[in-house]
């Protein structure tokens, strides 16, 4: 078994600490109670960024306020509800026939001749 240097062991232990703990240990951070509002603000900003990415129709190059982002999200949810509330289109005037594999991808269908080579 190899002996570990004390410096390397300390380095590995420090790397495992969270950023907040490391900042407090170095003395440049504030108390956890003082940092909590900042981390909540970062979390909220991250959430608004994710909403902006996920909702279609939000322009990429323009700056939107948080209220505008929320309004676009609400509009998108309402649009989805309308689409889901519409009745599904019914089958055509004939009987409903299941789709066969041969209709989807005929090249995947194995004939009896080819099947005999498999065994």
UniProtKB/Swiss-Prot annotation:
This is DNA-binding protein inhibitor ID-3. PANTHER family: DNA-BINDING PROTEIN INHIBITOR (PTHR11723), DNA-BINDING PROTEIN INHIBITOR ID-3 (PTHR11723:SF16). Transcriptional regulator (lacking a basic DNA binding domain) which negatively regulates the basic helix-loop-helix (bHLH) transcription factors by forming heterodimers and inhibiting their DNA binding and transcriptional activity. Implicated in regulating a variety of cellular processes, including cellular growth, senescence, differentiation, apoptosis, angiogenesis, and neoplastic transformation. Involved in myogenesis by inhibiting skeletal muscle and cardiac myocyte differentiation and promoting muscle precursor cells proliferation. Pfam families: HLH. The keyword Ligase does not apply. One of its GO terms (cellular component) is nucleus. GO terms for biological process: cellular response to leptomycin B; central nervous system development; circadian rhythm; epithelial cell differentiation; heart development; metanephros development; muscle organ development; negative regulation of DNA-templated transcription. InterPro entries: bHLH_dom (IPR011598), DNA-bd_prot-inh (IPR026052), HLH_DNA-bd_sf (IPR036638). GO terms for molecular function: bHLH transcription factor binding; leptomycin B binding; protein dimerization activity; protein domain specific binding; transcription corepressor activity; transcription regulator inhibitor activity.
